[in-house]
Amino acid sequence: MSTPTEFTFTDYQPYDFANRRHIGPSPSEMADMLKVIGYSSLDKLIDATLPPSIRQKAPLVWGAPMTEREALDKLRETANKNKVLVSLIGQGYYGTITPPVIQRTILENPAWYTAYTPYQPEISQGRLEALLNYQTMICDLTGLDVANASLLDEATAAAEGMAMAERVAKSKAKAFFVDADCHPQTIALIKTRAEPLGWSVIVGNPFTDLDPVDVFGAIFQYPGTHGHIHDFTGLIARLHQTGAIAVVAADPLALTLLKSPGEMGADIAIGCSQRFGVPVGYGGPHAAYMAVKDAYKRSMPGRLVGVSVDARGNRAYRLSLQTREQHIRREKATSNICTAQVLLAVMASMYAVFHGPQGLKAIAQQVHQKAVLMAKGLEKLGYTIEQETFFDTITVEVGHMQGLILRAAVAEGVNLRKVGETKIGMSLDERTRPATLEAVWRAFGGNFRLADFEPGYRLPKTLLRTSEYLTHPIFHMNRAESEMTRYIRRLSDRDLALDRSMIPLGSCTMKLNATAEMLPISWPEFSDIHPFVPTDQALGYREMIDDLTEKLCAVTGYDAFSMQPNSGAQGEYAGLLTIRNYHIANGEGHRDICLIPTSAHGTNPASAQMAGMKVVVIKVSDDGDIDMADFRAKAEQYAANLSCCMITYPSTHGVFEETVKEICDLVHKHGGQVYLDGANMNAMVGLSRPGDIGSDVSHLNLHKTFCIPHGGGGPGMGPIGVKAHLAEHLPGHPETDGRPGAVSAAAFGSASILPISWSYCLMMGGEGLTQATKVAILNANYIAARLKGAYDVLYKSKTGRVAHECIIDTRPLVDSAGVTVDDVAKRLIDCGFHAPTMSWPVAGTLMIEPTESETKAELDRFCAAMLAIREEARAIEEGRMDKTDNPLKNAPHTVEDLVGEWNRPYSREQACFPPGAFRVDKYWSPVNRVDNVYGDRNLVCSCPPVESYAEAAE
C-alpha cells in the first residue's frame, strides 16, 4: 500500500444541488450518451435541436446557486417574516389539526405525493381506493348520490356548479341567482365565469329576491358566510317547479350535525374539505368537492373514481366516465378540469377514516360549543349576536368600535373578520383554545374566564341531522394509529410512483421533487397563514412571491405574472380572459375567434369555450408541424374577429417548430394575441423565452417545470405571465385589489406550495436551470436513439432531433402481431414502469418524456424493457408465441398468477420477470388488467358493501 506524500484537495462539489442531486446523469454518463446519439458535446446537441431564431441572447443569471442548507436557511428567514396569529376570519378557511400520522405518512411521503393522475388503474389502486373513500364521505355527508374525486377550491367548484346547472336545467333562462350570504370570493368567481358565457348573475336574499322563473339555477350557502343557517327546502321546491337547478355550498363539518343538502332536495352540493385536516396555507391547496343526484352524473365535471373488475373478476378501481372530460371531448367537455386536488382529497378522506363518524361529530360539537360560549361572553358585554342559531360563525354589531376592537384583537394575537363598516365576524374551529376565547373577550372589553359560562347549543332544532353517515366499515376500522399507519402503507404499496421508478409521461414532466424543496410546506409559518390576513402578517409570503415572479419573468421574457391560477387549465382560462379583457378595453370585444391546432392539449379548446371564444381548428401536417397554409388561410378568413391563437412550444409532437415566429407575427398582423401553452417549458428554460419569440401570454405548470409534485392528480399551479400591454388585465381579487376577474378562491392560488418552486430556483440558479433543460433534451434524444430500429420515432426536426420528449409508433404492431398500445403499456407494468403517455397526440402511439432527473441506469432499464417488448411482439409475428395467449395480452401479471395454476404457453419467469424488472424489489401489480367497459356500464362510485369484496373474488 502506497503512502501519500502530500494532501491534495478535490474539486468535487458535494453540495452542488443541480449536478449532484437534481440532474440524473453524471458528466461521464452524458459523454457516453452523446456518443450513442452522435454528438461530441452537449452544446452541439442543443445547437442542433433548437432553431437559432428562437435562442435567447443572454444567459439566465441571478446569483450563485444555494446549497440545500443555505436554501432552507433562506426559506426559514423568509418564513419568519410571516406572523402566525390565531385567525378566526373564517370565510371558507378554518383552523384544523392535521393528524400527525396523516402528515407523516401521506403529506410528507413521496409514495403519495410523487404519483401521477391514475389514468393507469392497475398501478393506482391505492390512491383510487383513498379517493373512493373521499367520494363516499362526500356522498354520505351531502345526502347525494354521486361525488367526484375533488375540484380545485370552493369558489371554482361553485362556478362549475353553475355551469353544470345551465347544462342540465330544463329552464331556458340565462340568469343565475347567488345567495348574498355566499363567501365573497365565491360570488366574485361566479361573476367571472358567467360573464363571457352571456349569463347574468343576480345576487340577493333568496327569501325576498329570488324569482325561480327568471333563473336556470341558484346557489345557497349552508351555513352562510356570516353564520346564518336557513332551511332551503321550500326554495328548492320552487326552483324545481320552473325547471331550475338548486346548488348548495355546504360546510362538510357542519353536515355532521345538520340536515344534508340532499334531504332538502338539492340537485348539486359543492364545498371544500379543507377543515378535514388540511392546513389553510395562505389559501391552498385544498380539495373542493361536488356531489350530484344520480340523474346528473354524466354532466358532472372532474375525475370520478368507480368500481370495476379485473381480468380475473376481482374488484378493481378506475377513473370512470372519462368521455366527459377535456382530454377526450375538448371544447365539448363538461369542464377544462385536468389537475384536481388528489393529495389533499386523500388527506381529507384519511381524516374521516381516522376519526370516523363519532370523531367527526364530536369535533363538530366541540366547535359549535366554542361558538356558543363566545356568543355568551359577548352578549354579557351587551353586544347583540346577529344570528339566533349558528354552527361555528357569529356576527356582532359593534358600530363605530369596529376598528378599535379589530386592532385590540390583533394585539391579543387574534384576527377577526371585518364585516361591512359596523360589524365583526368570527369563526371558531377545531384549533380554537380557551385562551383564544378569553383573548377575544378582552378585545371587546371583557375580562371573563371560560369557566364563567355554561356550555349549550344554538343549532336550529328543525335542521338537526337524523340520518346516518360514514356507515361503511372503512370508517370504523382504523382508529388505532398502528392500524391507520398500516392501512396507509398497504394502499401506497399498491401504487407506482416516482419513489419506485421513472414515470416517462410525455407532456407531464415527472421530474425530481427534492426533499429539501418539500420540507418548508409543513412549517407553520407557511401552513398556518389565513389567506385574508392583513398584508403585514404575510410579508414573508409577499417577499417570496415577488422574488419568484421576478425569476419567472427572467425565464420567460414576460413583464408581469399572476400566481392566482391553481392549475394549468385554470392558467389557460385566466390567460384567455386576460386577452378577452384586453380586446374589450380596446373597443374590440367582438374578437372571439381562437385558432387551435388539432394537436393541442384538450384543455386548450375547453378553456377557450369557457372564455366565450369560438374554436377554429388548424390542421397539422404529416411531419407534426402546424400546417402553415391552413394557418394563414384561417388567420386571414377570421381576421376581423380574431382574438388569439393557442400554440404549444415545443410542439405537442416533441419538436421545436421553426415557423413559430412566423405564426406569432401572422396573428399580430391580424389583430390577435398569441397564447403559448407552457406545458413544455422544461425544454426551454435558459435556452429560449416565449416573450422573445412573439408570445403575449403563457401559463407555467409549476407542478411540471418547477418541481411541485403531481400528488397523484393534484395539487398544481398554473401562474400566467404576460407582456406589459396585458398586465392591467390580469385577474383581480375582492380581498386584495378589489378588481374583478378572480379565477381562484384565494388571491395567490395554492400559495403554500410556492416554496417548492422558489427553493428549486434558489438551489439551481440560472446556470443550473439551463443545464437541466439541456439534460432533459439529452435524455429524450438518448431514448430515441436507443429505441431506433425497434420503433419508429414519429416526429423529428430537420436535423433529426427531438426536444424533451419523443413519440414512438406502436401502431405497426397491431397489424403484424395484434399487439395494441394498451398491451405495451400493461406489459411495462410487469417491468416496473408507468407507461408513457398513450395515444396522445397521436392515437396508438407512446409519448416519452424522461426529464433531466433520471439517471442513465434508469433510462437503460426502460430501454431494455421497451426492446424486450418489441422482441415479444416479434415472437408473435414469427409464430413463436401465441397471438392471444402471450405475456403482452395477459399483462400485467400478478402474484395470484404466479402462485396459481399455470397453463400458459410461456413460463412464469417470462411473465413476471421480463428485462427491466427487478427481482428482489419487483413491483407487483395488485390487480390484473382492469375492465373499463364493465366499470362504465355498471357504475359504482362509492365504497362497495363489504359483501361485494368477497363476491368479486368468486
UniProtKB/Swiss-Prot annotation:
Cofactor(s) essential for the protein: pyridoxal 5'-phosphate
N6-(pyridoxal phosphate)lysine modification, residue list: 704
Enzyme class, UniProt record, top EC level: oxidoreductase
Matches recorded under Pfam families: GcvP2_C (PF21478), GDC-P (PF02347)
Keywords: Oxidoreductase, Pyridoxal phosphate
Keyword Oxidoreductase assigned: yes
InterPro entries: GcvP, GDC-P_C, GDC-P_N, GDC_P, PyrdxlP-dep_Trfase, PyrdxlP-dep_Trfase_major, PyrdxlP-dep_Trfase_small
GO biological process entries: glycine decarboxylation via glycine cleavage system
Residue runs in coiled coils: none
KW Oxidoreductase (keyword) present: yes
PANTHER family: GLYCINE DEHYDROGENASE (DECARBOXYLATING), MITOCHONDRIAL, GLYCINE DEHYDROGENASE, DECARBOXYLATING
Alphabetized HAMAP family for the sequence: GcvP
Subunit-structure text: The glycine cleavage system is composed of four proteins: P, T, L and H.
Family of this protein: Belongs to the GcvP family.
Stated name of the protein: Glycine dehydrogenase (decarboxylating)
Gene (name only): gcvP
